[in-house]
C-alpha cells in the first residue's frame, strides 16, 4: 500500500496530541488518531450523504456523512471539517462541534481505523459540487428513509456512520427541543 505523504495527529483517549504519523502507517498499525465526521442538513431536515469514491483506501463506494477526514496538526476538528467540506463537496458551511467518540474497525485490506472522531454538524441548502477523486455520488434523505435503508442494507454504509448515526439523531432532537 502506497504512502500519501499526509500525516495524522496521534492522540491519547483524552484527545491530547502525542505526535504525528504518516496517514497510511497509522492505519496499518491501528494507532489512535484524531478525525472528524461532518453531518450536513438542509432546511427540510434531510441528511446529506456522500458515496465515497471507489478507489479510496478503505470503504470505497460506501455511503457516509457529508464529509469525513483528519485535521492537520495546527487546526481544530471543526476548522478541518469546514475546509474539507469545500474540498470534497464544493460547499461552504461552518462546522459546529457536537460530540466525539472513539472507535476501532479492521478492514479486509489489513488497514485499521482507530479514531477519536469529532462529530460536527452544519446546515446548508447549497447544492454540492463533489470532487470526483473523493465522491462518486451524493443524495439527501429524510431521517425515516435513512433509517429504513440502514436497517435493510447496513453494509452499504461506512462503519463510523453506522456507529454514530443514532447519537447524532438523538443530539439533533435535543437541540431542536431547546431551540
Regions found by a protein language model. Give the residues of each.
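Histidine-centered active-site/metal-ligand motif
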Residues: 27, 33, 70, 114, ...
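A glycine-rich, hydrophobic loop/mini-helix early in the fold
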Residues: 35-67
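Nudix hydrolase/Nudix homology domain
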Residues: 22, 61, 73, 102, ...
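Acidic, metal-coordinating catalytic segment for phosphate/diphosphate chemistry
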Residues: 2-37, 43
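The catalytic Nudix box helix
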Residues: 48-49, 64-98
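A structural signal for short, well-ordered beta-strand segments
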Residues: 38, 67, 97, 118-120
Amino acid at each position: 500500500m502506497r504512502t500519501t505523504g499526509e500525516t495524522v495527529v496521534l492522540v491519547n483517549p483524552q484527545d491530547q496530541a502525542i505526535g504525528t504519523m504518516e496517514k497510511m502507517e497509522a492505519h496499518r498499525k491501528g494507532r489512535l488518531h484524531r478525525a472528524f465526521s461532518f453531518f450536513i442538513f438542509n432546511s427540510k431536515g434531510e441528511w446529506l450523504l456522500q458515496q465515497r469514491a471507489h478507489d479510496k483506501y478503505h470503504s470505497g463506494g460506501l455511503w457516509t456523512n457529508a464529509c469525513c477526514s483528519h485535521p492537520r496538526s495546527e487546526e481544530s476538528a471543526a476548522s478541518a471539517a469546514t475546509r474539507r467540506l469545500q474540498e470534497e463537496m464544493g460547499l461552504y458551511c461552518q462546522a459546529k462541534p457536537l460530540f466525539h467518540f472513539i472507535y476501532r474497525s479492521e478492514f479486509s485490506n489489513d488497514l485499521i481505523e482507530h479514531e477519536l472522531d469529532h462529530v460536527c454538524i452544519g446546515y446548508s441548502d447549497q447544492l454540492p459540487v463533489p470532487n470526483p477523486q473523493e465522491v462518486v455520488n451524493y443524495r439527501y434523505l429524510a431521517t425515516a428513509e435513512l433509517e429504513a435503508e440502514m436497517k435493510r442494507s447496513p453494509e452499504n454504509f461506512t462503519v463510523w456512520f453506522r456507529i454514530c448515526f443514532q447519537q447524532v439523531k438523538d443530539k439533533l432532537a435535543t437541540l431542536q427541543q431547546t431551540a
